[in-house]
Amino acid sequence: MHIRRCIISDIHGCYDEFNALLRQVNVDLNQDELILLGDYVDRGPKSRQVVEQIMQLREKHGVVVIKGNHDAMMVKALMNDVEEYDRHWIRNGGLQTLGSYVEIHFDEEQIDWSAYTEAKQWIRSRYEHHLRFLSELPLVYEVPGYIFVHAGINPDVEDWRGQPERDFIWIREAFYTRPTSIPGTVVFGHTPVKHLHDHADIWFDPSGDKIGIDGGCAYGAQLNLLEIGEDGSLQKFHVKKGETGEGSAD
């Protein structure tokens, strides 16, 4: 069956840009396949709203939702009381996520740890379904000719499907600087494409085995969408950070 596929990665709480992009490309969730490559939370302002929306999109429309490293980091910090996990999450934009759930502004320079712990407990009790949803997300999605993953695949692992979760959601240079040596094209996020070709548009590896789509929206750049048409053609779309209409695209 030939269908139009629309792929977005690294939304990072950029809820308004995400919905503006869905509207711009006229994504029809009854016909098109929407594939999301992870990192729904952290850094941006509306992580809770993004998580709620993608949960509904998967339930209602079968949208493909893949796990990213920030999603795993959030769950690890919130479901445990381990300072190392908390500090790691906070260094990577976790306070913005926390603020979207509890509407308290946390100062990263001078954290009120008792308020932080209280907020964690509240999220655990009130939003356990969010944490469970994020923790159980798949790491990869395959269709003929394409592998969709958050960070990449490890060329040093004989069968990439057996690589550890860490590679699926964290790998960088070991993946994108080397040939994959497998059939098909790997579509990935995680590494902002400006690190791959000095601008925020979708990166197409010259060898044809990789496509990087993280436009760095949470860093002030843009949110990208890769369209794989019914005929197999590739098109790229984007919304710049802050260039949005309001509301969600159903």
Language-model features, listed with the residues they occupy:
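Active-site environment of divalent metal-dependent phosphoester hydrolases
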Residues: 12-16, 42-45, 72-75, 190-197, ...
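Residue-level marker for buried hydrophobic side chains located in beta-strands
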Residues: 7, 34-36, 65-66, 147, ...
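Short, charged, surface-exposed secondary-structure boundary motifs
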Residues: 97, 220-224, 246-249
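N-terminal active-site segment of His-dependent metallophosphoesterases
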Residues: 1-53
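Divalent metal-coordination and catalytic microenvironments
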Residues: 10, 39, 54, 68-69, ...
